[in-house]
Amino acid sequence: MGDRSGVGGEEGEKSVLGASAHSQAGRRQQHTPAARRGAQRAPAATAAAASRPVFAMRWCCGGSYSENGGGGGGSRGAPPTPLLTVAATSSSTAHDTFGPMQVKMLKTAVIVTEGTGESVLLDSLRASGWICTVSFPTQATSDVESICPLAVFIDLRVPHPSQIAKDVSSVSTEEVLIVSIAEKHISEKRRRALAQSNIIHHVTWNTRDVVLFDYVGRLANRIRALPALFAVLDETDQAVEICDEQRVVQYVNRAYENVTGCIRSEVIGQPESEMRRKSLPRARGEEERRRSCDWKFIRVPFANNSQFVYMKRSNTTGDTAAIFRDVSLKSLKSQTGGIEAPISEVLTMLRDVSARVDGEPAQTIKDAMKVLSSHELYAPSINRFRDADRIATQYYDGLIRLHHPARQRKRSVVDAHREKRGSHGERRRVSADVKNALENDNCWKFDILHLEKVSDHHALSQVGMKVFERWKVCDVLGCSDDLLHRWILSIEAHYHAGNTYHNATHAADVLQATSFFLDSPSVAVHVNESHAVAALLAAAVHDLDHPGRGNAYLINTRQSLAILYNDNSILENHHIALAFQLTLQHNANVNIFSSLSREEFIQMRHAMVEMVLATDISRHFEYLAKFNKMHVTDVPEEQRDTNSLTICDMLVKCADISNPAREWGLCQRWAHRIVEEYFEQTREEKEKGLPVTMEVFDRNTCNVPITQCGFIDMFAREAFATFTEFAKLGELSDQLESNYEKWKVMTSQWTPTHNTNLVL
């Protein structure tokens, strides 16, 4: 037994804090308050810090503690008949079972008083295993911040106890029980007043009843273990969904967000959805498994069944990375050969390796992937084509290589964003035929060529105003409806009506497709308003003043535009530059940006330029790889605009090459139009003795269905598979494949005689 102090016949005891100043002489030795605080605060802070979960590769909830720095514990003197006693053991052996987890019962408290704090209450707390630190009012805030106690007791005799309680609440990173202490019970009126300062309980100095504090301490220690569990759930590769007894979603982890594309805030609080779980992409190699087996129901081991947990089964092949949004990190390998950006292969290998390692190597690999994803390393490498595949080779030579070394570089990517603007119908007067033709402009089967006919080749201005009004473009730009109408008429007038394909109707078609893509909820949630408007405007101007000849032709003929833009994205640079020249000229009165601030205009212009340049087919694989590296969950707020722009780049690009995915009749007619334009370019190149850009488009020998299959193989299939998976518009890829099969059937039936009068 320890020595006894003669004060009040109290039994001396070894301090639970393990401070040497208290171990032999008893608690009432004559020490200064500062010395007492120093002896108590340091071990309490150390023990409190040790109790916090720390994430490395495993999770710990609490550190070890022994009296006097050792592992043993001597007998403890019994306090004056407390209501709740604890065995005279080291505090390090007190544990609580929280489900399958063992939680250390580390109970820390701060006593805020100007005295010593010694009392029946303090004796009872210590006897019950509480580690108590006495703190002066001036030190209370810093002590609470460093120790992170479960409870704070405030002596009502100190000055401004309510303010101390507020200060303690403001600095505490954990939930803390704040209790007032007085010589006697206080009135109900004062209790209510103290409650305004987060003081929610009251005791007297001579109370021995600490059962409530022990119970709160037990719950608080359990609650403080939960962040470790949530952090582990967020790090796991398997998607997890937790529902309450009403089957309302309470929690989903980060892997669930990656798999579904749904942000956590969108799902929590919503009823569970079996359809949502069934619609999730499967891990690779699990195609034979029934959908109902993809998700495992985990029964929570409690009688009331108040929670339901669903976990996506891991891939049987062990490829844990497959649960992430598989927007084709590895390309869909076109049938024409291996088209793969080297950076995609590197990142795929790194991702596979990271799934097999833990700890520091895994983090190092993630850091390396982040660096690689943020550098301009996405220009494609065309490995090889089959010798007999002239179509793919000539598409590459004519549209990408341009008869000179192409050195495309790429900006970095990130992710995520906000919502689109609402919609309402048109106000402008139009003829009945035009109005009927515009009836379903928000549908994918919309017939823009019929609108071209009934509007006398004014499809762009007609569908443009309908789309702009639905998306409230005037509100975003701060311009009038009349001004916007004058602008779109000016843009329409500068398209070449003589071009069979690159004319104002094609611009209208791309604008309608852009609006359709933006209308997808899976897209809209990630795109901010200004980028949505920029995408619509960019679609309208993306081929402005197109001469009906490609970039390679302009280079070979040494056109002034090729010289001006140094053979880089010649037409795309010209389209957007002319659009801004026409818009900003003072005497035209069509400046739709006049109400924007300088910063707003710069941002709008940057977005439009970026989106129009993304339509350069020679940079197709660059932008595709950029989109593939994008993640749309758990991204910092400052990176969401970058992600929004990346989505819009891909969106406008897909709209520009969307003809193969249109309804079959439209698909055919658009194909005939662009082939006719290529026929004319090939004829002119041969007449002038120029290098022939794509010899396959010779009217006398061309098999049009083969050229369309080649374009789908090389460009359209992967782009649409990638984007429509993200946008949840799988029916478009289905239509593209259906058209592909029709073209394929026609290849054996096509003869050069069909090439006459393709466009009637």
From Swiss-Prot:
Gene Ontology process terms (BP): cAMP-mediated signaling; negative regulation of oocyte maturation; positive regulation of ERK1 and ERK2 cascade
Task: Provide the E.C. number(s) assigned to this enzyme.
Answer: 3.1.4.17
Cofactor(s) needed by this chain: a divalent metal cation
State one Pfam family annotation.
Answer: PDEase_I
Family classification? Belongs to the cyclic nucleotide phosphodiesterase family.
Quote the PANTHER family the UniProt record gives. Answer: CYCLIC NUCLEOTIDE PHOSPHODIESTERASE
Name of protein: Probable 3',5'-cyclic phosphodiesterase pde-6
Q: Which organism is it from?
A: Caenorhabditis elegans
- Gene coding for it: pde-6
